[in-house]
Amino acid sequence: MKASMYLALAGLVLLFVVGYASESEEKEFPRELLSKIFAVDDFKGEERGCKGFGDSCTPGKNECCPNYACSSKHKWCKVYLGK
């Protein structure tokens, strides 16, 4: 059962990569794909002035980013729904 799930997942990933490659007009597809995959690492070095979703915070202080609020119960930034 596990093997068939992994095989199906690998097939979907392969289908996605082949579909993306067929639509790509550039010759440097592997390098472009890898740079897009690992581009997330560039954002880790940046510091924000506010805390994002799931970051610990102190209730009463305005530490969370816009659209987030510090939960007094859990003491981490949650999405503010206006309640």
UniProtKB/Swiss-Prot annotation:
Keywords: Amidation, Disulfide bond, Ion channel impairing toxin, Knottin, Neurotoxin, Presynaptic neurotoxin, Secreted, Signal, Toxin, Voltage-gated sodium channel impairing toxin
Transmembrane segments: none
Domain of life, source organism: Eukaryota
MF (Gene Ontology): ion channel inhibitor activity; sodium channel regulator activity; toxin activity
Cysteine pairs bridged by disulfides in the record: 50-65, 57-70, 64-77
Signal peptide, first to last residue: 1-21
Leucine amide modified-residue sites: 81
Tissue expression from the record: Expressed by the venom gland.
GO cellular component: extracellular region; host cell presynaptic membrane
Compartments (UniProt record): Secreted
Propeptide stretch(es), residue numbers: 22-48
Additional remarks: Negative results: has no activity on Nav1.4, Nav1.5, Nav1.8 and Nav1.9 sodium and calcium currents.
Domain notes: The presence of a 'disulfide through disulfide knot' structurally defines this protein as a knottin.
Subunit structure: Monomer.
Role: Selective antagonist of neuronal tetrodotoxin (TTX)-sensitive voltage-gated sodium channels (IC(50)=1270 nM on Nav1.1/SCN1A, 270 nM on Nav1.2/SCN2A, 491 nM on Nav1.3/SCN3A and 232 nM on Nav1.7/SCN9A). This toxin suppress Nav1.7 current amplitude without significantly altering the activation, inactivation, and repriming kinetics. Short extreme depolarizations partially activate the toxin-bound channel, indicating voltage-dependent inhibition of this toxin. This toxin increases the deactivation of the Nav1.7 current after extreme depolarizations.
Family: Belongs to the neurotoxin 10 (Hwtx-1) family. 15 (Hntx-3) subfamily.
Protein name: Hainantoxin-III 2
